[in-house]
Every structure is written in C-alpha cells, then in structure tokens.
Amino acid sequence: MSVRYQLVIDCADPDRLARFWAAALGYELAPPPAGFAAWDDFYRSIGVPEEELTGGADRISDPHGGGPAIWFQVVSDPKAVKNRLHIDIHASGDRTDPIETRKKRVDAEAARLVGLGATLTVVMEQEGLDHYAVGMKDPEGNEFDIN
C-alpha cells in the first residue's frame, strides 16, 4: 500500500520559493482549507504563534493531482551544506530522442528557470555517454537538476 506524502523545504522566504517552484513545476499555489481566507488564518486557528506566520503563500500542489504537495517551512538557520534530497526536473523528453534534441530542451528549461531566479551551477555531460543534465540552485541556494 502506498501512502500520501508531501515534501517540505526549509527556507527563509516561503512565499518567494513557493512562487518559484510553482512556476518551475507547473504547480499552483495551494488554496487554504475550506472556511479560511488565507493559510495564516488556518494556522492561527490551530495555535501557530504569530511570529511563525509568513503572511504569504507557503504551499503548492499539482493541479492534476499526480505529484506531491510541497510545503515551504520557515527556518532561522541559513542553508549551509549540500541538500541530502533534491528535485530532478525531467525536461529532455524520451531517451529515444537524439541527444542534441534533449540537450536543447534541457538548456531551454534551464534558461527559463534562470529567468525565474535560479542559478546554473554545473553542466553534466561526458563524452560518449547518452546523458546530459545541468545542476542548478533555486533562489535560496537549494540544489536541483534538470535532465
């Protein structure tokens, strides 16, 4: 039996990262639970202290229901080391497509995400291998790959 889950990303600015990742993944900002005008209203109702409220978006969801929800949680500690878990965005298409076609797709997606605030950190390509990917960082420095 599978279980439902959500990913949680620690960050300094949940609204900024929620908007970045919603655009990156084709997700939507998740609406607050029924009966609440905003997530902060819901959080207040369950006793979350005012100083922990973000005043903006902090959750995103797949509009088609296939992917996990992602919650962006405020933490006071800055990111210091490489992520132990990261997101891979599959933009290259089918492996039966020519490598040059797949490279163009990956590079186009990387350029789009740079326009949203990401940073390109590394190109992963080895002579003779049928693989091409790029390493990137989101606006707060969390690593992810596009392949």
Residue ranges and their predicted role:
Residues 2-9, 23-25, 32-34, 44-53, ...:
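Vicinal oxygen chelate
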